[in-house]
C-alpha cells in the first residue's frame, strides 16, 4: 500500500469512528437528557474504541464534542441544559485514530419538532446532497458554495458566512476551506 492509500485508510477509520459515535448516541436523544451527558457518552465511546476526542482541550475547549441546540449555529458547548420536546440538536464529533482525524456531525430532533425546524433540517440536507451531486473533476470549490447558497435562499433561509467546511487528514482543520456561499457574491 502506498503512502496515500495508507493515509486514506487511516482517515476512513477515523471517520468511521466519528460516525459510529453518532450512531451510538442516537437512541439516547430524548427529552430530559443533558448535553453534558451526551458529551460524556460520546467521550467514553471514542475512548473505548481506541480513539481520542479532538476538540477536548483544543484552544481551551473543555468538552469532547460540540452540541448546538436550536438557534446555536455550530460549536455549542455541552452543559447542564436538558433536551426538551421540539428541540433540534446538532452533534459535531471529531475523533482522532492513528493520528488522523475524522470529523462529522448529525442533526437530531427531540420529540416532535416544529414545521419550521423540519423545513430548516430538510433544506440544509437537500443543499448538502445537491452540492455532493455536482462534485467531479474540474469543479471549483465556489461551485459547491454556489449550489448550497442558491438552494438555501430559494427556501427563504440564509447561509452562515462566518464558518465553513474544511479538509481532514493528520491535522484537525486543514485545507481546503469550503464556503457555503457563492464566491461570485464576495
List PLM regions with ranges.
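Active-site neighborhoods and metal-handling regions in enzymes and metal-associated proteins
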Residues: 1-184
Amino acid at each position: 500500500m502506498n503512502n496515500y492509500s495508507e493515509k486514506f485508510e487511516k482517515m476512513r477509520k477515523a471517520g468511521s469512528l466519528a460516525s459510529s459515535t453518532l450512531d451510538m448516541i442516537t437512541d439516547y436523544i430524548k427529552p430530559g437528557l443533558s448535553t453534558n451527558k451526551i458529551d460524556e457518552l460520546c467521550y467514553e465511546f471514542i475512548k473505548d474504541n481506541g480513539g481520542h476526542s479532538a476538540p477536548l482541550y483544543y484552544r481551551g475547549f473543555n468538552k469532547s464534542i460540540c452540541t448546538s441546540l436550536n438557534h446555536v449555529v455550530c460549536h455549542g458547548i455541552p452543559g447542564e441544559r436538558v433536551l426538551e420536546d421540539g428541540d433540534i440538536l446538532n452533534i459535531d464529533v471529531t475523533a482522532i485514530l492513528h493520528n488522523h482525524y475524522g470529523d462529522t456531525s448529525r442533526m437530531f430532533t427531540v420529540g416532535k419538532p416544529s414545521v419550521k425546524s423540519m423545513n430548516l433540517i430538510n433544506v440544509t440536507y437537500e443543499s448538502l446532497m445537491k452540492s455532493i451531486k455536482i462534485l467531479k473533476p474540474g469543479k471549483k470549490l465556489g461551485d459547491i458554495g454556489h449550489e448550497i447558497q442558491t438552494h438555501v435562499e430559494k427556501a427563504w433561509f440564509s447561509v452562515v458566512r462566518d464558518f465553513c467546511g474544511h479538509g481532514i487528514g493528520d491535522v484537525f482543520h486543514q485545507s481546503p476551506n469550503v464556503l457555503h456561499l457563492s464566491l461570485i457574491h464576495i
